[in-house]
Amino acid sequence: MSFDSGCPPTPPVKLLFKKHSPFAVTPQRATSGAAGYDLCSSADVVVPPKSRSLIPTDLSFQFPRGVYGRIAPRSGLAVKFFIDVGAGVIDSDYRGIVSVLLFNFSDHNFNVRRGDRIAQLILERHLTPDLEERSGLDETARGAAGFGSTGGFDTGVCPSSFS
């Protein structure tokens, strides 16, 4: 079965990157269905307990038009070692070397070795609309109700597996 959208084929989109040292590792997707490209450390770094460290990749990127890069955590590092990622937006006009801010929430040093996969780069489309200030906004059923306002864990929608 084939799908014909009726539109002319779009040219392939490319993510351009530059290696700034022989220790930079080409980003790769672990599987064909992976959303992100794995980013690897270009140096040995220790992330102290309850602290953070900036991990170099020695890579810079040129994103397709209308796209920015988001640095996201790797789930295995979070689950096994309490490692998370911070400050994860790479603007489309940034051409400098990308580093990854790792937070260590554990009580032990986290040793990053050169070549270790430390995060993933996910490409996301973005809009930059013109701003228009208004004295009021359209009303909604939710209104200004904030954190936790849409319900807790006991919604009755999903059966509990903890009983």
Swiss-Prot record:
Its cofactor is Mg(2+). It is an enzyme of class 3 (hydrolase). InterPro entries: dUTPase, dUTPase-like, dUTPase-like_sf, dUTPase_trimeric. The keyword Lyase does not apply. NCBIfam families: dut, PRK00601.1. Belongs to the dUTPase family. This is Deoxyuridine 5'-triphosphate nucleotidohydrolase. It comes from Avian adenovirus 8 (strain ATCC A-2A).
